[in-house]
UniProtKB/Swiss-Prot annotation:
Subunit structure of this chain's protein: Homodimer.
Cofactor(s), names only, from the UniProt record: NH4(+); K(+)
A GO molecular-function annotation: ATP binding
Its EC number(s): 2.7.1.33
Family, as annotated: Belongs to the type III pantothenate kinase family.
Source organism: Finegoldia magna (strain ATCC 29328 / DSM 20472 / WAL 2508)
Biological processes annotated in GO: coenzyme A biosynthetic process
Record's keyword terms, sorted: ATP-binding, Coenzyme A biosynthesis, Cytoplasm, Kinase, Metal-binding, Nucleotide-binding, Potassium, Transferase
UniProt name for this protein: Type III pantothenate kinase
Gene that encodes the chain: coaX
Binding site for ATP: D9, I10, G11, N12, T13, N14, I15, V16, T135
Active site: D112 (proton acceptor)
Lineage per the UniProt record: Bacteria, Bacillati, Bacillota, Tissierellia, Tissierellales
Length: 262
């Protein structure tokens, strides 16, 4: 019999499930976030994922959930309890994290940002800037003393691209991919250029302003990217040196370990 930890990261676009055996992430699944699914449907999805990976449900001893989608709480915790028979730990502003939340109103911070901050402080040297390039783009700064100061939030790449399509009469829906040239020779290529290179510029400028405000050089700060579009955008950045797509799942594991005996 194994001691397995289930971690669930509920995002606006996707839900990511991970299975940890000891300190190793052995399986990861990504499903679409669906507000209309019932707890029974999510329980069936969980069952399929575990069976596909040959993980016995009796081996899953712990579960932890971090969510930025309030409407799926308590749907997914209920699914975990129904299928696995365990009460999942929920990440909120009261949970032990090992960092100091210096946000003006700590409960306002998205738990994904705190989870990422916890993970970054454990895995990398501080101070650190985390850029999460997902549905929204978040920037977070954590000091040498593991103080979470906050950061910036910008609209995401997909949201912005969708807005061009929805709010104009003639602009088409486009695939988000790296264009061959900044100067697009078609409407689609021009839009791809504006969206992709525009966001590279946005990300680098905000990082630059954070460094300036904290009186740091880029060599004095660990600068990490994560999120669905991190591989597309971060490789073109002048400042980002690490791409860590598992930072949130690792953070959930770290927080679970911190709260195990509470």
């Amino acid at each position: 019999m194994e001691d397995i930890l289930l971690v669930i990261d509920i995002g606006n676009t996707n839900i990511v499930l991970g299975i940890f055996k000891d300190d190793e992430l052995i399986f990861e699944w990504r499903i679409s976030t669906d507000l209309h699914k019932t707890s029974d449907e999510y329980a069936l999805t969980l069952r399929q994922a575990l069976e596909y990976s040959n993980v016995k449900k009796s081996d899953v001893k712990e579960a932890i959930i971090g969510s930025v989608v309030p409407n799926l709480m308590p749907t997914i915790p209920k699914a975990v309890k129904k299928y696995l028979g365990i009460e999942p730990l929920i990440v909120d502003e009261k949970i032990k994290t090992g960092i100091v939340n210096k946000y003006a109103s700590p409960k306002e911070v998205g738990v994904d940002r705190i989870i990422n901050a916890v993970s970054a402080c454990k895995k990398y040297s501080t101070p650190v800037i985390i850029v999460d390039i997902g549905t929204a783009i978040t920037f977070d700064y954590i000091t040498e003393n593991k103080e979470y100061l906050g950061g910036a939030i910008a609209p995401g790449i997909a949201i912005s691209s969708e807005a061009l399509f929805m709010k104009t009469a003639k602009l088409p829906k486009i695939e988000i991919e790296m264009p061959d040239s900044v100067i697009g020779d078609s409407t689609v290529k021009s839009m791809q250029s504006g969206v992709v290179f525009g966001f590279i510029g946005l990300i680098d400028y905000i990082i630059e302003k954070i460094l300036e405000e904290k009186d740091k050089t880029k060599d004095e700060v660990t600068i990490i990217a994560t999120g669905g579009f991190s591989y597309l955008i971060a490789k073109q950045s002048k400042y980002i040196t690490i791409i860590d797509k598992l930072i949130t799942l690792d953070g959930l594991k770290i927080i679970n370990d911190l709260n195990k005996n509470d």
